[in-house]
Amino acid sequence: MRIGNGYDVHRLAPGQKLVLGGVEIPFECGLIGWSDADVLTHAIMDSLLGAAALGDIGLYFPPGDPKFKGISSLKLLEQVTALLAEKGFGIINVDSVIVAEEPKLRGHVDTMRKHLAKAMGIDPGRVGIKASTSEQLGFVGREEGMAAWAVALVDEK
């Protein structure tokens, strides 16, 4: 078995869509990025790639590549999952935390878990998501952005 960690952060801006865990969440601001800027899914992908010692998402989906402009991060997660399978790895579980002051995310967590689990081909019971704040400290506390951390456990088949 192997463990990997992932982290991502994106800026918030008015007029952008907010997508977390593949779920569009109603909010006056969204995250800025080359893809859909899904900070949670990006952290999960990095944790999976790290567990398999396969680099990070920037290696496979570089910012600036027109193929990935505005793409759903769930589609990228499907590709990461396929890469792991090709290299002989299976996903046991992932656990994650999103750090944001607003909006409140508790009501969206189950839907996020289902979307992420489907993209990874695992049961939603193997996907942990927690939402937290930074107690109004730092860039997250000033509502300038959001961050996410993830841990993945994979096994070699």
Curated annotation (Swiss-Prot):
Q: Which residues bind a divalent metal cation?
A: D8, H10, H42
Q: How is the cofactor bound?
A: Binds 1 divalent metal cation per subunit.
EC number(s) stated in the UniProt entry for this protein: 4.6.1.12
CC cofactor? a divalent metal cation
The protein's matches in PROSITE patterns, at most eight in alphabetical order, are given as: ISPF
Q: Where is this site: Transition state stabilizer?
A: T133
Q: Which reaction does it catalyse?
A: 4-CDP-2-C-methyl-D-erythritol 2-phosphate = 2-C-methyl-D-erythritol 2,4-cyclic diphosphate + CMP
The answer to whether keyword Iron applies is no
User: Per the similarity annotation, which family is this?
Assistant: Belongs to the IspF family.
Q: What does this protein do?
A: Involved in the biosynthesis of isopentenyl diphosphate (IPP) and dimethylallyl diphosphate (DMAPP), two major building blocks of isoprenoid compounds. Catalyzes the conversion of 4-diphosphocytidyl-2-C-methyl-D-erythritol 2-phosphate (CDP-ME2P) to 2-C-methyl-D-erythritol 2,4-cyclodiphosphate (ME-CPP) with a corresponding release of cytidine 5-monophosphate (CMP).
Question: What is this protein identified as?
Answer: 2-C-methyl-D-erythritol 2,4-cyclodiphosphate synthase
Classification of source organism: Bacteria, Bacillati, Chloroflexota, Dehalococcoidia, Dehalococcoidales
